[in-house]
């Protein structure tokens, strides 16, 4: 069994390396990279570990999932992928167990709320369960690879010629969305710089290289400029269970200004960012970084007298959002609960 031991050791090292990277903040990895890497590790866990039935496998996935999410609670994509895999295990077990897909669907809100109490032991053994689960995970990985392209393909439905579009900070999804629209439409993009991180400058450079007329402005000018804007298009870190956003700091200000001027606010986000979390879960919601960009350490006299916090994310309530554009189409914030019931099982909301 030396081969199996070596494989197990290599997998443990990969998981440990991933957990350490999460603790350090994930570096420059995008949410899509995180999702893909999480799925890859879970697939290896399923193939390399020994388990005899779906119940044991789900407990194994939950244990590793808790370990990954505890390393960086604010990186909700990791937990979302763990829940997607748990849902896949339940569905594949149900098919082999002889339960039809229709009976497993939650076609009403009442059933969605009560289904958490219906438990199944998942103790029956099926030889082909592993291969079916791996195949479903591979399909999910293929789906992940096309998420940005699927969102960008909808750009021409929402962006029209000579419009003024506002965005904030840097988002790969929004950049792809605007680039796709620019292939056939001419429009002007205003980018709020998103201080103190100033990621908006990177966004503006990329859009300018694509031939899009782009202007960078300070966050303080958002309200003054909003009256000229036709649409606000933003990305987000997480879509919460109530249809709200956990987005980069400054987004709430932007959303309030858009609401005041009745400017549509569109959120471009793939489905893997949809999380069953609610905004009252403070440990996983808040993330603070060193406030050096706000108040440099050279300001010694002031530093002795003040305590400075630098939050990374804003909470944006659902009533400020007009439309979500995901890889499966456009939806209103009120429809999020339905999408969530299709992605995650109620028993898996808490790992």
UniProtKB/Swiss-Prot annotation:
Protein's cellular compartments? Cytoplasm, Cytosol
Gene Ontology molecular-function annotations:
ATP binding; GTP binding; guanyl-nucleotide exchange factor activity; translation initiation factor activity
Q: Could you list this entry's UniProt keywords, alphabetically sorted.
A: Cytoplasm, Initiation factor, Protein biosynthesis
Q: Is DNA repair a UniProt keyword of this protein?
A: no
Q: Which InterPro entries match?
A: eIF2B_beta_subunit, IF-2B-related, IF_2B-like_C, NagB/RpiA_transferase-like
Q: Does the keyword Endoplasmic reticulum apply?
A: no
What name does the UniProt record give this protein?
A: Translation initiation factor eIF2B subunit beta
Q: Which organism is it from?
A: Bos taurus
């Amino acid at each position: 069994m030396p081969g199996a031991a070596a494989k197990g050791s290599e997998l443990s090292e990969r998981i440990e390396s991933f957990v350490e990277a999460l603790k350090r903040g994930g570096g420059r990895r995008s949410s899509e990279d995180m999702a893909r890497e999480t799925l890859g590790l879970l697939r290896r866990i399923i193939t390399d570990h020994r388990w005899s039935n779906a119940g044991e496998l789900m407990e194994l996935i939950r244990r590793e999932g808790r370990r990954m999410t505890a390393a960086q609670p604010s990186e909700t994509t990791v937990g979302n992928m763990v829940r997607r895999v748990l849902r896949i295990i339940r569905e594949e077990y149900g098919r082999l167990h002889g339960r039809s897909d229709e009976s497993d669907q939650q076609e009403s809100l009442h059933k969605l709320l009560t289904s958490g109490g219906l438990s199944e032991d998942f103790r029956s053994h099926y030889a082909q369960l592993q291969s079916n689960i791996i195949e479903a995970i591979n399909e999910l990985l293929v789906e992940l690879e096309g998420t940005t392209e699927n969102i960008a393909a909808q750009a021409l439905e929402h962006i029209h010629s000579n419009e003024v579009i506002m965005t904030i900070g840097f988002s790969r999804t929004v950049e792809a969305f605007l680039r796709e629209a620019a292939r056939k439409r001419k429009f002007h993009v205003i980018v709020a710089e998103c201080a103190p991180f100033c990621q908006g400058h990177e966004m503006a450079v990329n859009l300018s290289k694509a031939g899009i007329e782009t202007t960078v402005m300070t966050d303080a000018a958002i309200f003054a400029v909003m009256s000229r804007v036709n649409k606000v298009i933003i990305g987000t870190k997480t879509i919460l269970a109530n249809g709200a956003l956990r987005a980069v700091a400054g987004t709430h200000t932007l959303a309030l200004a858009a609401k005041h001027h009745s400017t549509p606010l569109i959120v471009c986000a793939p489905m893997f960012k949809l999380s069953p979390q609610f905004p009252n879960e403070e440990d996983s919601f808040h993330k603070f970084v060193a406030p050096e960009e706000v108040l440099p350490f050279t300001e010694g006299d002031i530093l002795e007298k003040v305590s400075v916090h630098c939050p990374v994310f804003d909470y944006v309530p659902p009533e400020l959002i007009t439309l979500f554009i995901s890889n499966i189409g456009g939806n209103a914030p009120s429809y999020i609960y339905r999408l969530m019931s299709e992605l995650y099982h109620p028993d898996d909301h808490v790992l």
